[in-house]
Structure formats: structure tokens, C-alpha cells
Amino acid sequence: RLKLNKTRMSQSISLYKQLANHKLFNKTINFDLTRIKLVLKKLSHPERKLNNVINFLGSSGKFTTLHSVKSFIEANNQTATAYISPSLKDIKERFWLGGRYLNHTEIKQSIKLIEKTKVPLTIFEVLTVIYIVNAAQQKVDYHLVEAGALFAKDSTNVFDFPLAQVVVNINKQHLNFLDKNKKTLDEVIYQKVGFLSNFTHIYIGKQTPYVLNKIKKNLRQNKSIITYANTWKLIKKNNHYFYQDKKFQIKINTKNIHSMGLLNNLCHAIKIALDLKIEKKIIEKTIPKITFEGRFQYLNKGKIKN
């Protein structure tokens, strides 16, 4: 098993090196939707085949919120693809196809397909196209898509009519991706929520009062349904945490989640799952099984190297 894991790791590293050293692909970060839209056009618009897309964007909590929503969907005997970044151990972790990960051979085949378009892309754009062309071939109920650093010109912002767009906590984490004269929290907020769809359901996660006020100003003209985090709360009773809204109270029975931020992300996902008509009893049974690998995770075995 150890030998197999080393082989997979070697294959993953090899694929990353192939992308990094590719003459057509660029290692730098360059936000622009023109390139990826041209590739998608040349590939006959596979993004239009993705039904029920849910975008996850923001600064902190995209993966944990997405993973929780995916866990609830799958516990409800439904299926979902998922695109996440970054991967923790293997490149294929980025591409979930509703029951399995994309394998290394399929990733290589997808790269060859993209090469034929002869359009220069950034590596993140390549990874996004790999996800889209493979997700388009899957018959699933939902497609869960995690954005990169920002959203305005992020390569995941290519779906015309997403089912929902989930905004997690926004902070100064991505200031370094902004122009020199625009490195402000206000600009981060604008880049993330100022370009959301007018034809979807927007969910806003827990924010500081300042960020929340700025988000509301940015969304003032947005025509979408908007659900803010004041519609639910995380409460503690008798040493137990609960999700609570006007209709439901759900016990957060978990030994795997070790921070208030992650608990709030879980609650945000519970709200979304309830709106997707997933029953309370299914959510309650699923919560103890949810783990966030590499996120405030206690390691009880294996060697830790200094």
C-alpha cells in the first residue's frame, strides 16, 4: 500500500511538473476570462452542460462549506461533482466526479484535448477546463465549484445561470492578487461579490460588521434572492452546539470539527442543504461523519517530521 501511495504521489508530481513546464501554459496568475471562454467555445461549450451549478467563493471556508454541502447531498442519495483547490496530496483530489476522482490517465487525456485548442492558459485555467470537460460528461444532480483567489475574472466564473452562489467569510487574505493601487479590503469585497449573478440564490456566510455592510452595498442592485447569515445561528446549550433557524434546531454532533469558524461553515452548509430539501434527519446522521482533512485536524498516528 505504501508503494502504491508513493507511485500515485509520483504521478501527481509529474502531472504538476508537466503543467508547470508546458510551453502553452503559464505559471503566473493573470485574471482574465477571455482565454478560458475561447477554449470553452472551441470545445463546444461544455460548461453549458453543467446543470445545478453551485459556486463557492470568498476568502476562508470555501472548501469546508463545499465539502459539507457535498456530504449532505450524497447522504440524500443524490450525486454531485466537485472542483476544489488546492489539492492536499494528489492532483486528482481537485476533480470529484460523483462517486470517484478523475484518474491520472484521464487528466493527461484532458490536457491533450486542451493543447489542441492552441490557446495559452494559466495553470489554474487549465485545471478548471479539465474539471468542466469531465463534469459535463457526468449525469449528476449538482456541480459544486470552488473559486480561486477572487471571482470577477476567476476562471470558475463562466456559468451563466448557477443554481446558487455561496459567499464564505471575506477578509484580507487575497490582497496580493490585486493591483498595487487597489490593495484594500473594499476592493477584495468588490472583486468577490460585485460580479455575482442576477439570476440565482446568493448565500452570504458569517462576516465582520464592516465586511457585511460593504457586501450589502455591493449587492444593492443585484436581483437575485439573497440569504444572509442572520437567518440562522450557531448556539450552545448544555455543552452541545446546535444549528438553529426559525424552523429547525439541529444538533452538531461531531468530534472532528475543532474551531468556531469551521462550525459556522458547517452551519452555513446546513442552511443550504435544508433549502435543497434535504431532510433534517439525514443532515443529523451525516454531521458526525464529516471531516475536513488538513483543516484543524488532529493527527493521532504517523510520523511528524520537524
Range-by-range predicted roles:
Residues L24-T28, L175, I304-N306:
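Acidic/glycine-enriched edge-of-secondary-structure segments
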